Design a protein with these regions (language model features):
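Intrinsically disordered, low-complexity non-transmembrane regions of multi-pass membrane transporters
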Residues: 1, 139-151
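Short, small-residue-biased leader/transition segments that mark boundaries at the very start
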Residues: 2-9
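Hydrophobic core segments of alpha-helical transmembrane domains in multi-pass membrane transport
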Residues: 12-25, 58-66, 83-94, 121-132, ...
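Inter-helical loop and helix-membrane interface segments of multi-pass membrane transporters/permeases
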Residues: 24-48, 85-115, 144-149, 181-197
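Membrane helical hairpin/interfacial module
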Residues: 40-64, 68-83
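Structural signature of hydrophobic alpha-helical transmembrane segments
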Residues: 46-55, 119-129, 201
Length: 234
């Protein structure tokens, strides 16, 4: 259900991105030439890049937010932003260019798009669980009654956010110093790539179809559930 809710949050951006991608690649040569020469194609490509290339961002925010809303956490939006911060912390911040030069201090769109989707799903659930647990255990800073609600919510989220970021920093350090990689790269190589091989097989397609049909039979939106899980893998 949480994955289905996340799909609903994410799909609006993907539909808009798809529309602009279609405009940039209209199968009419005369129109396509005008779009390309006028610079409209570059604008459409930028819109596409800012939607499809940020799918992992939308995913981690959507899953964390849906998890916390399901647990009736009032400061769910703060938890969702914490999930985003955790995701950025655990993904590569450098990239080697074709020239061999290494660029640091960046957020690579390679990892905010398809490559980072499984990592985003895992982080979304992990952050949602820890944040919700902190709220249930009343691990927060309480402010006096006269303090504005916005300020009080910020302080009440301080300890859960600090705990989550500290845990993610430890995970980052373990991956960096022991495995010489990042958490996102580790997940991609250990989980996502092998799963791609399974889902590309004949039996994988059969299993996906059966599971989707069973979900529909029980009254659950099989397309949203299976799509939310399988589209990142594919």
């Amino acid at each position: 259900r949480l994955v289905g809710s996340e799909m609903c949050i994410r799909d609006r951006f993907l539909m808009i991105g798809s529309l602009f991608l279609l405009i940039a690649n209209l199968p009419i040569e005369s129109v396509s030439k005008v779009i390309s020469e006028s610079g409209i194609g570059d604008v459409c490509s930028q819109v596409y890049s800012s939607t499809f290339s940020l799918m992992a961002f939308f995913t981690v925010i959507g899953i964390t937010y849906s998890y916390l809303k399901n647990d009736q956490v009032i400061t769910a939006i703060n938890g969702a932003l914490t999930g985003l911060a955790a995701f950025i912390l655990l993904t590569p911040s450098s990239k080697v260019l074709d020239s061999g030069e290494s660029v640091t201090g960046i957020i690579s769109k390679d990892w905010t798009a398809g490559q980072g989707m499984i990592c985003a799903i895992l982080i979304g659930f992990l952050v949602g669980y820890i944040y919700s647990l902190c709220v249930k255990k009343d691990i927060s800073i309480k402010m006096p009654d006269g303090v504005p609600s916005g300020v009080a919510d910020s302080f009440s989220s301080l300890l859960p956010t600090g705990i989550i970021i500290t845990i993610c920093a430890i995970i980052y350090a373990i991956c960096h110093f022991i495995f010489n990689t990042t958490f996102a790269e580790l997940i991609y190589s250990v989980i996502q790539i092998p799963l791609q091989g399974i889902t590309d097989s004949f039996f994988g397609v059969i299993i996906m179809t059966v599971v989707m049909s069973l979900l529909w039979w029980t009254g659950v939106h099989g397309g949203s559930i299976c799509g939310g899980i399988l589209s990142p893998i594919l």
